[in-house]
């Protein structure tokens, strides 16, 4: 990690509350902006908010607030302003002229965190693509800002020099990235098809950012994911084997955390993680039961899944942090839910049991077969490709009496039918 990434910049947060936004939603949104700032290695000095009928077309907030901000920047020696909404190119230009300090908006802040966290080649390419697409219409407006922004929050990824080059260069780079990404995506698609062909069930772990997905991903798969109490800790898809209590193996994918007010363009930029969701046989939806806005977080995830056309995939909901759950917490997911906490050792086994039970009820078909002991190859396949409940050797008939569960479309079904 270089020195630039460890510098803690001092930030003032700026928010504009419009009539359709409730006080509670606005407060949660500003708190989340503070968490995002912390994740990006920033230090929040204070927040400046204003209630308006509509955002000022020129400066987002009113002229008086702009003057107040200018004075605050000098008084608190702030390094940057972070706006809670996406600023238009003209707003950015006007504000940069009025206040001599670096400024970014919520979208840039999220992109910056994406750039900081990405680890795979595809993740890095997609972040650069999203940043360039965001920067292209803002080149003129940001000119003043970029020349004095230096490093720090909002400067990761493509970098200052790329953003200051002409539009043609950026468009060429966007074209190059799209070409490279299409190759990577084709490769991943072939890999996913191969996994499907092998008959392995795929489960996607989704949830609002910071709900505890990476912790549970590690616990359920014994993998070394990036576990930290920071927003967007996971950006690249991670898929690992998870062994259920019966010995049946499935694939579990960890995904980037969802967030409210996330522009659709940002969702599109992270196809790598979200494709895993669309291809899943089952979605595990993790919700932080200790968060005061847990119901809002749940709605956000469900809405984004609908936008991804993944809302018809079977879902098991897990309410996390049950040891810290709110006193008035009420599960909203109906019968298909479980309460868990990573603090309790036994909950990992209970979580796996719940997943296994759900698979049996909703996705697998029960079978009974009596397979001759001489069918060694088939017996081996049964152990690896089905969820076995009973595997008893009948000495009298020299056969194995087997019962369990299997996917209906698996090729092994044809072999099993001979002995059912």
Curated annotation (Swiss-Prot):
CDD domains: HflX
Domain annotation Hflx-type G: ranges: 201-363
Disruption phenotype: No visible phenotype.
MF terms in GO: GTP binding; GTPase activity; metal ion binding; ribosome binding
Subcellular location as annotated: Cytoplasm
Binding site for GTP: 207-214, 232-236, 254-257, 320-323, 341-343
Gene3D superfamilies: 6.10.250.2860, GTPase HflX, N-terminal domain (3.40.50.11060), P-loop containing nucleotide triphosphate hydrolases (3.40.50.300)
Known cofactor(s): Mg(2+)
GO cellular component, one term: cytoplasm
InterPro entries: G_HFLX_dom, GTP-bd, GTP-bd_M, GTPase_HflX, GTPase_HflX_N, GTPase_HflX_N_sf, P-loop_NTPase
Top-rank taxon, per record: Bacteria
Keyword set includes Cell cycle: no
Keywords annotated in UniProt: Cytoplasm, GTP-binding, Magnesium, Metal-binding, Nucleotide-binding
Residue ranges of coiled coil: none
Residue numbers binding Mg(2+): 214, 234
Keyword Cytoplasm: yes
Main location as per UniProt: cytoplasm
Family indicated by similarity: Belongs to the TRAFAC class OBG-HflX-like GTPase superfamily. HflX GTPase family.
Function: GTPase that associates with the 50S ribosomal subunit and may have a role during protein synthesis or ribosome biogenesis.
The protein's assembly and partners: Monomer. Associates with the 50S ribosomal subunit.
Name of the protein described by the UniProt record: GTPase HflX
The species this protein was found in: Bacillus subtilis (strain 168)
Gene that encodes the chain: hflX
